[in-house]
């Protein structure tokens, strides 16, 4: 998908775990930038020092909104078709150079982090009726672990319209805003962030997305916010702490429904920078098993994040015995 981060020339290849490409000279094609699949800042066209920038800021004719990390991209003048993804509440925008993930904008006309927005006209089902428009927000996998996991092939994300989600490690709310789009006005996102600086941005975002409940607290102390949360359908965890498995476990005991889902992003270097990432991932999965989580799948977040894994689990706090 089209979120490459290229540069000034030379085929840099998969800078962060990408797929090939030599370094090249100053005027080369600058390949898979930060681990994308080809095309740098200006798309696939070779640039040279004085050459055209290509799709850098708006597609082939350099319109105003190009794909610098997927923020304001798209091919100028091309019709975009938006189709449902297999995960409910997630969509795929087709028609540009590459397919892009998207969510329905819960607050039409506003972006959260400078992401591109696409408006699609919906024909009226009644003859002679007025058509309506739906606005979508492009979801950048370089800015969201959940988007990276979906592109990596997650079988299930456990959340859909109407779901209640506990999001641990909400930061300034970039990913949270897309989760809020997915669950929609009938769902809720309880977003926990310890940093007061990021918490301010999170609160500002939540003033417009009223299904987001910002909680500026330490996720290690869930009793501090127990009165704010009901039982939730899924926990998404991106806390990047050495004891993150324990943090998830104590929150699950208080808030996660029996049979609920867990998606946890594991950053190997935050847990043990001396051990191989695969060994760290295996150790964390074992800790999750001890807390009654049953792993369903594990996948890497390359090329969007280096030495990260996403683990999907089902929570079974009670032991079931077959008669």
Curated annotation (Swiss-Prot):
<comment type="subunit">
    <text>Component of box C/D small nucleolar ribonucleoprotein (snoRNP) particles.</text>
</comment>
<dbReference type="GO" id="GO:0031167">
    <property type="term" value="P:rRNA methylation"/>
</dbReference>
<feature type="binding site">
    <location>
        <begin position="193"/>
        <end position="194"/>
    </location>
    <ligand>
        <name>S-adenosyl-L-methionine</name>
    </ligand>
</feature>
<feature type="compositionally biased region" description="Gly residues">
    <location>
        <begin position="8"/>
        <end position="76"/>
    </location>
</feature>
<dbReference type="GO" id="GO:0032040">
    <property type="term" value="C:small-subunit processome"/>
</dbReference>
<dbReference type="GO" id="GO:0005730">
    <property type="term" value="C:nucleolus"/>
</dbReference>
<feature type="modified residue" description="Asymmetric dimethylarginine">
    <location>
        <position position="62"/>
    </location>
</feature>
<feature type="modified residue" description="Asymmetric dimethylarginine">
    <location>
        <position position="8"/>
    </location>
</feature>
<dbReference type="Pfam" id="PF01269">
    <property type="entry name" value="Fibrillarin"/>
</dbReference>
<keyword id="KW-0949">S-adenosyl-L-methionine</keyword>
<dbReference type="GO" id="GO:0008649">
    <property type="term" value="F:rRNA methyltransferase activity"/>
</dbReference>
<feature type="modified residue" description="Asymmetric dimethylarginine">
    <location>
        <position position="47"/>
    </location>
</feature>
<keyword id="KW-0808">Transferase</keyword>
<feature type="modified residue" description="Asymmetric dimethylarginine">
    <location>
        <position position="68"/>
    </location>
</feature>
<keyword id="KW-0489">Methyltransferase</keyword>
<keyword id="KW-0488">Methylation</keyword>
<feature type="modified residue" description="Asymmetric dimethylarginine">
    <location>
        <position position="64"/>
    </location>
</feature>
<feature type="modified residue" description="Asymmetric dimethylarginine">
    <location>
        <position position="23"/>
    </location>
</feature>
<dbReference type="GO" id="GO:0031428">
    <property type="term" value="C:box C/D methylation guide snoRNP complex"/>
</dbReference>
<feature type="modified residue" description="Asymmetric dimethylarginine">
    <location>
        <position position="41"/>
    </location>
</feature>
<dbReference type="InterPro" id="IPR029063">
    <property type="entry name" value="SAM-dependent_MTases_sf"/>
</dbReference>
<dbReference type="GO" id="GO:1990259">
    <property type="term" value="F:histone H2AQ104 methyltransferase activity"/>
</dbReference>
<keyword id="KW-0687">Ribonucleoprotein</keyword>
<feature type="modified residue" description="Asymmetric dimethylarginine">
    <location>
        <position position="57"/>
    </location>
</feature>
<feature type="modified residue" description="Asymmetric dimethylarginine">
    <location>
        <position position="49"/>
    </location>
</feature>
<feature type="modified residue" description="Asymmetric dimethylarginine">
    <location>
        <position position="34"/>
    </location>
</feature>
<dbReference type="GO" id="GO:0003723">
    <property type="term" value="F:RNA binding"/>
</dbReference>
<feature type="binding site">
    <location>
        <begin position="174"/>
        <end position="175"/>
    </location>
    <ligand>
        <name>S-adenosyl-L-methionine</name>
    </ligand>
</feature>
<protein>
    <recommendedName>
        <fullName>rRNA 2'-O-methyltransferase fibrillarin</fullName>
        <ecNumber>2.1.1.-</ecNumber>
    </recommendedName>
</protein>
<feature type="region of interest" description="Disordered">
    <location>
        <begin position="1"/>
        <end position="80"/>
    </location>
</feature>
<feature type="modified residue" description="Asymmetric dimethylarginine">
    <location>
        <position position="12"/>
    </location>
</feature>
<feature type="modified residue" description="Asymmetric dimethylarginine">
    <location>
        <position position="16"/>
    </location>
</feature>
<dbReference type="GO" id="GO:0000494">
    <property type="term" value="P:box C/D sno(s)RNA 3'-end processing"/>
</dbReference>
<feature type="modified residue" description="Asymmetric dimethylarginine">
    <location>
        <position position="26"/>
    </location>
</feature>
<feature type="modified residue" description="Asymmetric dimethylarginine">
    <location>
        <position position="53"/>
    </location>
</feature>
<comment type="function">
    <text>S-adenosyl-L-methionine-dependent methyltransferase that has the ability to methylate both RNAs and proteins. Involved in pre-rRNA processing. Utilizes the methyl donor S-adenosyl-L-methionine to catalyze the site-specific 2'-hydroxyl methylation of ribose moieties in pre-ribosomal RNA. Site specificity is provided by a guide RNA that base pairs with the substrate. Methylation occurs at a characteristic distance from the sequence involved in base pairing with the guide RNA.</text>
</comment>
<feature type="modified residue" description="Asymmetric dimethylarginine">
    <location>
        <position position="30"/>
    </location>
</feature>
<feature type="modified residue" description="Asymmetric dimethylarginine">
    <location>
        <position position="5"/>
    </location>
</feature>
<dbReference type="InterPro" id="IPR000692">
    <property type="entry name" value="Fibrillarin"/>
</dbReference>
<feature type="binding site">
    <location>
        <begin position="218"/>
        <end position="219"/>
    </location>
    <ligand>
        <name>S-adenosyl-L-methionine</name>
    </ligand>
</feature>
<feature type="binding site">
    <location>
        <begin position="238"/>
        <end position="241"/>
    </location>
    <ligand>
        <name>S-adenosyl-L-methionine</name>
    </ligand>
</feature>
<comment type="similarity">
    <text>Belongs to the methyltransferase superfamily. Fibrillarin family.</text>
</comment>
